[in-house]
């Protein structure tokens, strides 16, 4: 499972490209949060990767147009619970997270609340100076 917020998609894209180049067909989920649909980076490439990989991309918009039919709001515990594997299948599942600090903190806290082992999630933190 990959969780990205905004430009935090960049390191996730590198991992997805590598998996595609290797012909990996494990089931993958990407939860990708942005403010608006227009702010979603790599849309076309993500569509291609969905075809090349066994990848489901879930877009989560915090300020979508009224006609948006996808997920709304922020990536929180309830949303993670909907898209993470069942608890009995989580022991072999890893979660990779990259995005703004508040999002990453909230996702990590939610994962702990969902009994995902701290050793099973990996965060890529960066700051703009």
Positions of PLM-derived features:
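FNR/FR-type flavoprotein reductase catalytic core
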Residues: 1-129
């Amino acid at each position: 499972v990959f969780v990205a917020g905004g430009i935090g998609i960049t390191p996730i894209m590198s991992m997805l490209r590598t998996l595609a180049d290797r012909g990996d067909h494990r089931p993958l989920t990407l939860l990708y949060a942005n403010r608006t649909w227009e702010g979603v980076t790599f849309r076309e490439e993500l569509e291609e990767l969905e075809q090349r990989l066994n990848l489901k991309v879930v877009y989560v918009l915090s300020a979508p147009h009224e006609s948006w039919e996808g997920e709304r709001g922020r990536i929180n515990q309830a949303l993670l619970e909907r898209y993470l594997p069942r608890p009995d299948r989580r022991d072999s599942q890893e979660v990779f997270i990259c995005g703004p600090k508040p999002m990453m903190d909230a996702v990590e806290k939610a994962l702990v609340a969902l009994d995902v082992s701290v050793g099973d999630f990996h965060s890529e933190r960066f700051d703009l100076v």
